Amino acid sequence: MAENEVKLTKLAKCAGCGAKVGAGVLAQLLGGMKVLQDPNLLVGFDKSDDASVYKVSEDLALVQTVDFFPPIADDPYVFGAIAATNALSDVYAMGGEPKLALNIMAVPESMPKETVHEILRGGYDKAYEAGVIITGGHSILDDEPKYGLAVTGFVHPDRVLTNSGARPGDVLLFTKPIGIGVLTSGMKADIVSAPTVELAYRLMTTLNKSARDAMVKYRVHACTDVTGFGPLGHLLEMAQGSGVEIRLDTAAVDFIPEAVELAKMGVLPAGMYRNRSFAEPWVDPGDKPVWLQDLLYDPQTAGGLAIAVDPADAEALLAELRGVVPSAQRWGEVRPYRGGKRIFLD
């Protein structure tokens, strides 16, 4: 980066999915809305799922989602690629295949055209990798840059994966390490090592396509991508939507080492506090240290898939996932709901 270039992250108050409106506030904002009832709407926003799904025919359903955010990287190309990876992930989480996308962009009038071009190029290249066609979009002027995609995909109506189908006995798998939100806070302060910055960028630009392709071969009952609401926020949505509770083996969680160091120092994104406020009443932390809890509330950007799979298929799916996503781990299990707390940290 040239010395006279403005760091993109300095133009944003929040980074990536850390800019999301809190889940509790969002629920209040959407409450009482008049929504048209349609029997072909297979998935709406009533259970806070990753995307909407609309049945078109007996063997075809549309999957639609939208995601955009302010810069999470100073390199404009990397920012564009991360934003596209994150937006496409919602379709993969539903078991679908993304096919079409539209750009959503806001840029300062003073931003060099070369910078804007690089943001778009990052998005286009990642969409190309995913087999997705970007057919247009919409752009506005704004003091804070933002970029993302509205994505349309397809899935068989009988093979839709939601966040509300987890069953007691299911094994919970997860595909990516945790700590991206903490790292991006540290990156804004220039206190993250170069190798860890590269690791973060690599994780955030890794499509969930391979994980999706693996999981649809097995008896997966529920899936969600873990992004802005953090691991515990998204798992809470799964537990509540499925009417179950989740026991999380914290020793199995793959925390990024430098994120652990920063969390212990108190380098935390604002989104972590919003996520904690939303999910904490439903979480039994046991005797786990505060830094570990903070990381489990940490907002992830382009995070991995949390997969609730039939126990008979768990080992085979985990082995296949590790063949394409080496960081895949067995995080815990789903239990019958006994009332009270929804998530227990073991």
Segments and roles (model prediction):
Residues 1-346:
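Helix-biased detector of long, well-ordered alpha-helical tracts
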